[in-house]
Amino acid sequence: GNSHEGSSTTPKGVYHLSFAFGKAASARTSGMAYRQINRKSYWIEDPHDRQYNTWQNRNWANNKNEHLIDYTKAAPHNQYQLAIVMDNHGQHNGSGFFIHVKNQWATAGCVSINYNDVRTLLSRLGTKAYVVDVQNRAQLQNY
């Protein structure tokens, strides 16, 4: 469906996979950039913030923003042990869409897969990787 801030739906369309991030200091990639999460790492999800839908290092961010390190702990809070950013630009189109580690809960619009599958995917993705999210084969012609 159509994604917007708070909709908990994965955006339909074609999205560039811009960079990966996670708990470890580094990850095996095929050219895709990787960032290590630290205590100051936030994904800005407040649509009124001028840095909306971006990774920022801050001393503090309001509760509308996602403190990434909170999701690198032991299961089930381990989604961001390893993740890949799906670029979804536009104000109020939803924010923080990632391909990340699967746990016991449904996502809030992200795509979740097993940890080893995230690692394998990341090891094969380059800088020009995209993800296509459609409901059926016929919709592919729209992209």
Sequence positions of predicted segments:
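Cell wall/extracellular polymer interaction/catalysis modules
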Residues: 1-107, 118-143
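A conserved hydrophobic position in a structured secondary element of the catalytic/binding core
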Residues: 113
